[in-house]
Amino acid sequence: MPKEKNHLNLVVIGHVDSGKSTSTGHLIYKCGGIDKRTIEKFEKEAAEMGKGSFKYAWVLDKLKAERERGITIDIALWNFETAKSVFTIIDAPGHRDFIKNMITGTSQADAAILIIASGQGEFEAGISKEGQTREHALLAFTMGVKQMIVAVNKMDDKSVNWDQGRFIEIKKELSDYLKKIWLQPRQDPFIPISGWHGDNMLEKSPNMPWFTGSTLIDALDALDQPKRPKDKPLRLPLQDVYKIGGIGTVPVGRVETGLLKPGMVLTFAPMNITTECKSVEMHHESLTEAEPGDNVGFTVKNLSVKDLRRGYVASDSKNDPAKDTTNFLAQVIVLNHPGQIQKGYAPVLDCHTAHIACKFDEIESKVDRRSGKVLEEEPKFIKSGEAALVRMVPQKPMCVEAFNQYPPLGRFAVRDMKQTVAVGVIKEVVKKEQKGMVTKAAQKKK
């Protein structure tokens, strides 16, 4: 994988039938890392299964199935290249229960493509109070996705028939909603596409001569390379931990801040486990150092797969190591809670890759969500649309950080009743000092 090109992690989000798989499959198929042999194999299988109308979603279904079977699937299959950048697609399917994954997924995304179905009734369902379009856009914002491209898909639908009026109507309604969330004017490009036929994906569409903007691939190429916080101390939330025969215990995750190097003595919070990092790999290649944005696997000495789990955070034991949390203060915005939230409420928080219940211990004040000005001290409750400063207590060991120091570990979503009821940003953390396990390998390096 050449390091020279910009490297961006891309999340593709949208309502469940917006045509996400087809559009994503199309990009990977045309610009991506799928070799001809694999495509021929998939095409043959598709024809045998009577899915002869083989369109790009099938590619994605096959990749997903292979990915679910094990870790060996080559991550390159999820990559595609443009003139300036290499994109890795972080999957974020649209169903409600996938929103949790999306919270952990988008916290690693540099940019998002929001795919909107333009069909009559379809767009309206997605943008309705119950639809997922709003929730997805909101989550992308809360989770720090700074750049977004809106692809208005299914322009070939019979009810739309490449109509400019429909595109303008959708753009206006969605822009108004996005403005409310972002709190400042932005220039997110809107592009009318057909993920099925490929209109405006790689080439200008002859069916929409009225559209003068760029194609999807050009818009992707124009995205800015995010600034990576290399000079901060290491923080690497674990996504998974594998046991690999002949190699040992391999935690996997994305470097959020700092650098990870072989030979480093790592401390894993919240359990305060310290050991040595033996080697670091990305895309099956050894690295001498991994930097922010890199999705890596690394081997550790003297630990079993049972010692580590998803949600733990790897850090440099000699440079501001990560710790367990006693409590933290957060600004919480309630989005769609049917009732009132009072102190004592203990929903599940999704913060980086951790998924842990936290108690609203004290609602300290109600604040204006735009200016942060205090509106009421110690309110009895908060409800939808309101923002508050809340002192929160994790109900199990958990590692979080203040947003201004380590942004990816300082924002969270509050999940309850199968939906995101609130989002928050952590202002300050009271950390817990504790004795922990130090492996032989780490003691030798002291």
From Swiss-Prot:
Residues 14-21 are annotated as: G1. GO terms for molecular function: GTP binding; GTPase activity; translation elongation factor activity. Residues 70-74 are annotated as: G2. InterPro entries: EFTu-like_2 (IPR004161), G_TR_CS (IPR031157), GTP-eEF1A_C (IPR054696), P-loop_NTPase (IPR027417), T_Tr_GTP-bd_dom (IPR000795), TRAFAC_GTPase_members (IPR050100), Transl_B-barrel_sf (IPR009000), Transl_elong_EF1A/Init_IF2_C (IPR009001). Residues 194-196 are annotated as: G5. One of its GO terms (cellular component) is cytoplasm. Residues 153-156 are annotated as: G4. The keyword Cytoplasm applies. Its main location: cytoplasm. Signal peptide: none annotated. It is found in: Cytoplasm. PROSITE patterns: G_TR_1 (PS00301), G_TR_2 (PS51722). It comes from the Eukaryota. HAMAP family: EF_Tu_A (MF_00118_A). This is Elongation factor 1-alpha.
